[in-house]
């Protein structure tokens, strides 16, 4: 997918503001039309009430905000961001996430956070890639929402196996005690930002760490939730 300055990257129509990257029509079209549970982000009957899964076994976070399923066109843009070093895509993707957050605030009273945090990469992977995609999403979000962000709020204590090929049970085991909190969060309303949430094992481990250290609430914001 070629990105052309001044044109929408998806429909190729001229942009009113060239740096946005994605036009308002495509931004609206990128959103999922499925009814999602406000807590786990999976398909549900109601978008304002927790689903049966969350009532029986709630995740360790209170809200999950997502733009869409992990499918084209968003999946293609995320892949380019992560693996083709197209860091200019990050701002446009952050804007899509911002619009979804503001929509949730208008329609469901979503609470804005005191601080947002990135899902960290292991040092070697960060060095190889040259950036952490979660950092690139957090940076403009923190500026637009006037909340705190520190790229080193959470660090990885060890290397972990690639999650993609692991079952949900092995993912949880793989991530056990893999993160360390580097700053106080007592009484703070926290948001974990990631590009894609699949089983939720990574964000669940971080959410549990935040809650153990006194965070008042934890939300998860992601571009894509595997539905």
From Swiss-Prot:
Xref: CDD domains: PRTases_typeI
The record ties this protein, via InterPro entries, to: ComF/GntX_DNA_util-trans (IPR051910), Competence_ComF (IPR005222), PRibTrfase_dom (IPR000836), PRTase-like (IPR029057)
Gene3D superfamilies associated with the record = 3.40.50.2020
Source organism's superkingdom? Answer: Bacteria
What is the role of this chain?
Could be involved in gluconate metabolism.
UniProt similarity note: Belongs to the ComF/GntX family.
Output this protein's name: DNA utilization protein YhgH
- The record lists the organism as Escherichia coli O157:H7
Q: Which gene encodes it?
A: gntX
